[in-house]
Amino acid sequence: MREEIIKKTERFMQAEISKLAFFQDNTPRMAQYRMEHSYRVAHIGAEIAAAEGFDRERTFVACLLHDIGYSLDYRDKQDYRNHGRYGAAIARPFLTELGYSGAEVEEMCYGIAIHVDDMADFEGERTPLALTVGDADNIDRFDAYRLYEGLQNVDYMNLPLREQKAHVERVRQRLAELRQMPCGTATATRMWQEKIDYQLEFYRRLGHQVQTSTWPSEGGKCFPDEKPLL
């Protein structure tokens, strides 16, 4: 990858994400997190590209820019769903200035546009590179940091035990469904399933802990498939 291209892309991404107009609780830390996430997605994308044999630099650049659409002033949840399409529009002239061909720019922008909800507002091809933008985003969103963030977002520590149990079960069911989600490449599929399996194991262990956090009360059973304690 060309260092000059990467450095220019870094500066552009940082300038756009620093705006973060979407977040009402905008703080320097919120912007910093979004930048950190973008870097992780870029590294994941480059790893996928290297394993699959397509352009690492363009994949890295597209992934690094995937969330710059957050810099606009949004009014509702639909605007949030559009942030990939908005990001593609912001990225297009910048990518052209970097010297990429028209076809290369469109492929990268298509990947940025579809990474949220698999839809774009312009025609494009679902190439491995384009699909990798969304795949890399999802892979990072289901890694270790989001375990912490997911529990923090529901104030898990302060939930009553019954609600903690219910939350764990809901998450486990959802993760089992998400594990079947198709990815654009074999490498992304492997990485995705590894992340989901990691979370499933965490929530299996957490579920065991919350189930054993009180004395059995229904027929002397800790678990539905256990014999009553004597």
Task: Write out the residue ranges for each language-model feature.
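Amphipathic alpha-helical segments in well-structured domains
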Residues: H83-G84, A88, L129
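Amphipathic alpha-helical segments within well-ordered protein domains
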Residues: A42, A46, A88, R92-T96
